Amino acid sequence: AVLGALPDIVQDQMMRLLEQLGLKNVFVLPQVKFDDDVSIGKNTHFICVQPFLGASYEEMVRRGAKPISANFPFGAEGTTKWLWAIAERFGISKAKFDTVVAAPKLRAEQAVAAVADGLRGKSVFFFPDSQLEIPLARFLAAECGMELTEVGSPFIHKSLVHADLEDLPATTQISE
């Protein structure tokens, strides 16, 4: 299961990639159609697409579902790590994974590179607002070369953002 609302085109692309990896029984919550039949239990594996889904995360765990931990899919690197966490959970080979994601990853890297030059070396400060701050900070530092002055977040759900926290520069000041 994938938790989090995505634009239709992004969800379609994601589902296509997951299918190409060989994953068949994938569903997204919230559902596109009200009458889609899904059940959640001990055989359900899930991953979140946004860091502010703490209550949904906790409910899935309460129902016995197994979380997949990963960076959030922000930028080429974050998205690749997010997809790899899913592939790895289901035993998909690195060779198959690399083949499936090669072209979309290259497009993503080119898109990020087109804006990164204008951001490289600049500093950014995140006021606590939406819980998106930590993965956005990771993306801007790692993929765009920005300096992080401080990263504030109204709440840090470590089960959700620990991978992005680990990838922040060691000197990053974090406030909650």
Language-model features, listed with the residues they occupy:
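An N-terminal assembly and electron-transfer interface module characteristic of large anaerobic redox
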Residues: A1-E176
